[in-house]
Amino acid sequence: MSFLDSLFGKRQRSSDIARDRLLTVLVHDRVKLTPDMMEQLKAELSTVIARYVPSVDAGAIEVTLMRGEAVDHLKADIPLRRTSQKL
């Protein structure tokens, strides 16, 4: 690994990117979640979580499906806005 690779990271090959995209499509197909259903899931997650955690950044929620070795995973990345209050 050269110094520049360690500094900037190694770029993914287009074949790796295409493989990841294909796996994502296959997982979505297997789980039967359409893009509209994913958007609805995001909206409902933000509504429910905002009831308990008011600092949820609803516009930045990301929901992804990932293929695991034994099971598929639904991952929700829910960022919170920082508040000026100290704990």
Swiss-Prot record:
Keywords: Cell cycle, Cell division. One of its GO terms (biological process) is cell division. InterPro entries: MinE, MinE_sf. Pfam families: MinE. Prevents the cell division inhibition by proteins MinC and MinD at internal division sites while permitting inhibition at polar sites. This ensures cell division at the proper site by restricting the formation of a division septum at the midpoint of the long axis of the cell. The lineage of its organism: Bacteria, Bacillati, Chloroflexota, Chloroflexia, Chloroflexales. The keyword tRNA-binding does not apply. This is Cell division topological specificity factor.
